[in-house]
Amino acid sequence: MGLKLNISNDLKKSGFMLRQSLLKTSVSNFLSLNASSTMSRAFIRNPKFYSTSSNDTVLYESKNGARIFTLNRPKVLNAINVDMIDSILPKLVSLEESNLAKVIILKGNGRSFSSGGDIKAAALSIQDGKLPEVRHAFAQEYRLSHTLATYQKPVVALMNGITMGGGSGLAMHVPFRIACEDTMFAMPETGIGYFTDVAASFFFSRLPGYFGTYLGLTSQIVKGYDCLRTGIATHFVPKHMFPHLEDRLAELNTSDISKINNTILEFAEFASSSPPTFTPDVMDVINKCFCKNDTVDIIRALKEYASNTSALAEFAKSTVKTLYSKSPTSIAVTNRLIKSAAKWSISEAFYYDHIVSYYMLKQPDFVEGVNAQLITKTKNPKWSKSHEYHFKDLENYFKLPSEYNNGISFAAKGRRKTPLWNYKTYPYL
C-alpha cells in the first residue's frame, strides 16, 4: 500500500495465542492516536447528544467476579456519546489491573445493545465547520473499541436487539459475542457515505469466505441465529436466559477463558427451527462474486447470476440494487480495506481506520448520505462519484495525512506501558 507503519518490534510480533487465561500477559503501549483524530459517533458540544452526567447513561455494577457495564440510553437505542466513552474507558483501564475483577460483561438496556454513534450530529457539526471536533470524537470510539479488542481479561458482550455501527465495534472483537433471538447485527456505513470502521475490516476479513466483504459493502442486517451460523456470534443464548447467565458468570469468580466458555455453553442453544438466510448456495454466490478486487467486477459478476433463471437470480438482482444504492466511494474503499485487512494485525486495522476516516469525513458523500437518510429523509442521496472505481484508484485513501506526521496514537490513558498485545488471528477459543 506504500505506507510504512511506525510500529515497535513488540507490535510486529503477531499471532500470540491465548491459552487458558487472558491474564497471562499484560497489555498496553498502544499505537496511540493523536488528538486531531479519535472517535465516538455521538456528540461533542451539542447538549442533546452530549450528556451532562455519565452516571445514568452507563450503569456500572460489581457482582462477585463480574464487572458489568450497561449502556443506558434506551430512548435512543443506546447510541454512544462521548460522555459514555469517558465513563467506560477509565474504568476498563482500572479493572484491567484489578485482581478482584475477573470478567467484563457488556450489555444494553431496552431493545438495543447499541445502535452506534450519532452520525446525524456529526454531519451537522461538519456543516458547522467543526470537522476537527468530529475527528476527535470518532477517535475516542476507536480507542474504546481497540481497548476491548486488546483487553487482558475476558469480555462478554450480550448482543440484545440492535447491534450496529459503533455498537458492533464494542462487541465484534471480544472473545464472547452472545446473540439471541432478537439480535440485529450490521455495519450500515456504506449507505451514509462512510466506511466500515472500528476495525470491522479485521473482523469481516476473518469470517467464512467473502461473507464479511458482502456484509461490509451491502450493510446487510444479520439476525438472530444467523449470527451464530455465520461466525458473527460465538454463542446463541435465549434472551430470557441472559440474567441467569450473567449471575453464573459472576459466581465463577475466574478469568479462565475455558471455564467461562463452558459456562456459556450450559445456557446455549445449538439448533434453531428457523431456516438459514444464508444457505450454502447463497454463500457460494457471495464467495464467487465478492472475491473480486474491484467493485465494478463484483457488480458485473452479480449481474451474470441475475441474468439467468436459477433460484439465485433474485438474490443477485437484489444485491446489485443494494450496491447501487450505496456510496460508490464507500463500497470501493470498504472493499479494499477488508481485502487488505486479511494480512493486517488488529492494531494495523485500527491504524488504517484513522487514516481512511480522515479522508472519508472530508469528501461530500458523508454529509450527503446522512442528510438524505436521517435529516431530510429523502432516502435518495446524490453520490459524488460513479461506480467505476478500481482497486489501484484508492491508494490516496490509505496514505498518512501530513498533519499526522507525528504519528497516530490511540492509547487509552493510564494503561500500563508494557509490550502491546497484538495479533493477526483472534486468540480466543
From Swiss-Prot:
Chemical reaction(s) catalysed: 3-hydroxy-2-methylpropanoyl-CoA + H2O = 3-hydroxy-2-methylpropanoate + CoA + H(+)
Entry keywords, A to Z: Branched-chain amino acid catabolism, Hydrolase, Mitochondrion, Ribonucleoprotein, Ribosomal protein
Pathway stated in the Swiss-Prot or TrEMBL entry: Amino-acid degradation; L-valine degradation
InterPro entries linked to this entry: ClpP/crotonase-like_dom_sf (IPR029045), ECH_dom (IPR045004), HIBYL-CoA-H (IPR032259)
Location of the protein in the cell: Mitochondrion
Gene Ontology biological process terms from the UniProt entry: mitochondrial translation; valine catabolic process
GO cellular component, one term: mitochondrion
This protein's record includes keyword Hydrolase: yes
EC number: 3.1.2.4
Pfam families attached to this UniProt entry: ECH_2
Main location (coarse class): mitochondrion
Molecular-function annotations in GO: 3-hydroxyisobutyryl-CoA hydrolase activity
Annotated substrate binding sites: 141, 166, 189, 197
Gene3D superfamilies in alphabetical order: 2-enoyl-CoA Hydratase, Chain A, domain 1 (3.90.226.10)
Quaternary state and interactors: Component of the mitochondrial small ribosomal subunit (mt-SSU). Mature yeast 74S mitochondrial ribosomes consist of a small (37S) and a large (54S) subunit. The 37S small subunit contains a 15S ribosomal RNA (15S mt-rRNA) and at least 32 different proteins. The 54S large subunit contains a 21S rRNA (21S mt-rRNA) and at least 45 different proteins. mS47/snr1 forms a protuberance of the yeast mitoribosome and retains a solvent-exposed cavity likely capable of accommodating a substrate, in accordance with it being an active enzyme as well as an integral constituent of the mitoribosome.
Biological role: Component of the mitochondrial ribosome (mitoribosome), a dedicated translation machinery responsible for the synthesis of mitochondrial genome-encoded proteins, including at least some of the essential transmembrane subunits of the mitochondrial respiratory chain. The mitoribosomes are attached to the mitochondrial inner membrane and translation products are cotranslationally integrated into the membrane. mS47/snr1 has enzymatic activity in vitro, and is able to catalyze the specific hydrolysis of 3-hydroxyisobutyryl-CoA (HIBYL-CoA).
Protein family: Belongs to the enoyl-CoA hydratase/isomerase family. Mitochondrion-specific ribosomal protein mS47 subfamily.
Protein name as annotated: Small ribosomal subunit protein mS47
